[in-house]
Every structure is written in C-alpha cells, then in structure tokens.
Design a protein with these regions (language model features):
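Ribosome large-subunit tunnel/peptidyl-transferase-proximal elements
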Residues: 2-94, 124-132, 136-138
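Strongly charged
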Residues: 98-138
Length: 138
C-alpha cells in the first residue's frame, strides 16, 4: 500500500535512486557526438588536474566545452558532497547523439537535380567523477 499521493511516492523513489557520484551534464550542445568522444577518450581514468591540462591544450572545439563541463563537475563535488579535488578522477564520460536539427535555408545538392537540407549534429555530454583513496590509506 502506498504511503501518500503517487507524486510523493515517485519523489521518494527518485530520491532513493538518485546518482551518488559527482557528475555534470551538458545537453543540446552544437558538436557532433563522434567528435566529442574523441576528446572524452583521452581523459577517462585521469585525475582531474591532469585531465584539465590535457583539455586546455587540445585544439579541438569540443575540448573547450568539455573543460568547462569538467570544472562544473568538480565544483559540484566540492560544494555538494564536500570532496577534495585532489582525490577526484574522471571515472566515466560519454557523449550521446542528441536531437539534430536542420539548417533552415541551406541545401546540399543530391542526385538527379534534387536537394536535401543540411543536418546539424547535436550531442549530450556527461562526466562522472570518482574518488581515489590516498596512497597512504589502504
């Protein structure tokens, strides 16, 4: 039997299943998910300081967006969970395909005199951080 209204039950259930790791999401960003994954593969498993340095000197456009997202995830970990940024590392990072949109007036010529609209790629990027234990503690 439920304790209250179904919206209250759903709120309690969602609170129990909420993600416990520090994380940050970037939604509907105007970069291809394939190009974002190339940058994300470089930082998975690295500590936060090293990952930020890699992103700072990466010439790709997606690296700038991912660096800001990493800074947001670190700030979430420090402010919301009270973790030290020296012990944090990038545990999981992924980019998924978002809902792409079409350029309104630009067309790409196709076969037999036809044309199709140019599709603009959009992606959703997520970064999850983990906490490494210090070398002294076992």
């Amino acid at each position: 039997m439920s304790k209250g209204h179904r919206s209250q039950d759903k709120k309690e259930r969602n609170k129990a299943n909420r993600e416990k790791r520090p994380h940050a999401h970037l939604r509907h960003v105007r970069v291809s998910d394939i190009k974002a994954r190339v940058v994300l593969r470089e930082i998975i498993g690295k500590n936060v300081v090293e990952a930020r340095a890699l992103l700072l000197y990466n010439p790709r456009y997606a690296a700038h967006l991912i660096r800001k997202l990493l800074d947001s995830a670190v700030a979430n970990a420090e402010n919301n969970m009270g973790l030290d940024h020296a012990t944090l590392f990038v545990q999981e990072a992924h980019a998924t395909k978002g809902s792409s949109y079409y350029s309104r007036w630009r067309l790409r010529p196709r076969a037999r005199g036809s044309a199709s609209r140019i599709e603009r790629k959009v992606s959703n990027i997520s970064i999850f951080l983990g906490e490494r234990q210090s070398a002294g503690a076992k």
